[in-house]
Amino acid sequence: MTLTQEFDTIAAISTPLGEGAIAIVRLSGTDALKIAQSVYKGKNLAQVASHTINYGHIFEEERLVDEVMVSVMRAPKTFTREDIVEINTHGGIAVTQEILQLLLRNGARLAEPGEFTKRAFLNGRIDLAQAESVMDLIRAKTDKAANIAVKQLDGSLSKMINNIRQEILESLAQVEVNIDYPEYDDVETMTSQMLLEKTAHFEQLLENLLSTAKRGKILREGLKTAIIGRPNVGKSSLLNQLLREEKAIVTDIAGTTRDVITEFANIGGVPLELVDTAGIRETDDLVEAIGIERSKKALAEADLVLLVLDASLELTDKDLELLELSKNANRIVLLNKTDLPEKLDINQISGDFIRISALKNENLSAVEEKINQIFFAGEIEAKDATVLSNARHISLVEEALKALKEANNGLALGLPVDLIQVDVTRCWQLLGEITGEAAPDELITQLFSQFCLGK
């Protein structure tokens, strides 16, 4: 059982700054109740039951600051495993800042970014992977990304990593006993063949986990998607339909989009970072020319390319150039303006295409299905599956897998078991960095500094 560490009492505004119905000022620490009581008039907070909400007022000496509801949660059954007080105020900037300053003047310290979650980690309530999933849940752009984050917050990834580490540790312990106590008969001798079988098993477990990384990373970070095409083929209309709001100017004047517009859209649970590029054409307009160069750069960096062609016109040389330019990309060719008579010769297009009308919002569901087919083999999210999505976790699993492969290569070359133990131990340590069991203090500090204030 992890013992709660002794810390000072911290305070921060936990809701976004700005105007709203309510805001929350949070306290955590040994003196949380005492400091809150020093500015609160209502029930005696030291005597109220845990996990209750209490009506009262905040005063600065005799001056009324706000009418509030105060939540009291006593250690250890709290997020930080410390006493927590949350003051629910009216959601104005001035009043929340004033209440925070009152708490700071009465003994609290302003929390650092992510310090509440850091205390939850240091006090043993969550591990490092779960702590990171808190931020992933906050930043999730779709329901499926949120589902992955909440499963990791619930400990699914941590449980899998801990189970693998435990198996590795048992093998390492057996090697150690064989080395240190060769005369001990009650422990089976770990031969090179036995260790090879075990490391091959661990390798398979990590490869299975790593196979989920592509799907997880896409759902967490999104697909960088470039919408390309000649001017006035309907790129901005498509962007507006995918976003379900007007973000781009739509006219029949070529060159209206003179730069790169970037927005996020939720397409069937997949976050698309949509880049509406300036129409690629020859132009003497300097500003538009710069936009076109950026469009070409966006095309080169894109995970997915949506090439829009005007089906109501014959293909131009520029259309054919774009078809050639994007042929090696993950590309979906969209024949737009199907609400008009079709003049485009489909025999000039190699590969699949989808007919749509961005203006009429027709057949865009087929685009969603095609994206799922390209990136997820038709299945976006396997139910109850543990998915790797965090870039740090993916990198550590890759390094751990590399260490196992080096161990296997050494065993194949006939190296002694005690030398192979070094690589297997490194694998075990790398996996421990995911959960925080073996993470250096500098890494922990750096990770929590990326959190928002009040979390």
Curated annotation (Swiss-Prot):
> Which CDD domains is this protein grouped with?
trmE, TrmE_N
Record-level GO BP terms:
tRNA methylation; tRNA wobble uridine modification
Give the enzyme class.
hydrolase
Q: Where does K(+) bind?
A: 232, 251, 253, 256
Task: Please state where this protein is localized.
Answer: Cytoplasm
Q: Enumerate the spans annotated as TrmE-type G domain.
A: 222-376
Q: Cellular component terms, GO, for this chain's entry?
A: cytosol
* Residues annotated as binding Mg(2+): 236, 257
For this chain's record, the cofactor binding note is: Binds 1 potassium ion per subunit.
Give one Pfam hit by family name.
MMR_HSR1
- Note the SUPFAM superfamilies from the entry: P-loop containing nucleoside triphosphate hydrolases (SSF52540), TrmE connector domain (SSF116878)
What cofactors does the UniProt entry give for this protein? Answer: K(+)
Q: Name one GO molecular function term.
A: GTPase activity
- Disulfide bond residue pairs: none
Positions that bind (6S)-5-formyl-5,6,7,8-tetrahydrofolate: 26, 86, 125, 455
> Organism's domain of life?
Bacteria
In short, the EC number is: 3.6.-.-
Chain sites annotated for binding GTP:
232-237, 251-257, 276-279
Keyword field: Cytoplasm, GTP-binding, Hydrolase, Magnesium, Metal-binding, Nucleotide-binding, Potassium, tRNA processing
Q: How does it assemble?
A: Homodimer. Heterotetramer of two MnmE and two MnmG subunits.
Functionally, this protein is described as follows: Exhibits a very high intrinsic GTPase hydrolysis rate. Involved in the addition of a carboxymethylaminomethyl (cmnm) group at the wobble position (U34) of certain tRNAs, forming tRNA-cmnm(5)s(2)U34.
**HAMAP family named in the record:** GTPase_MnmE (MF_00379)
Query: Would you identify the family this protein belongs to, as annotated?
Result: Belongs to the TRAFAC class TrmE-Era-EngA-EngB-Septin-like GTPase superfamily. TrmE GTPase family.
Protein name, please? tRNA modification GTPase MnmE
The scientific name of the source species is Lactococcus lactis subsp. cremoris (strain MG1363)
Its gene?
Answer: mnmE
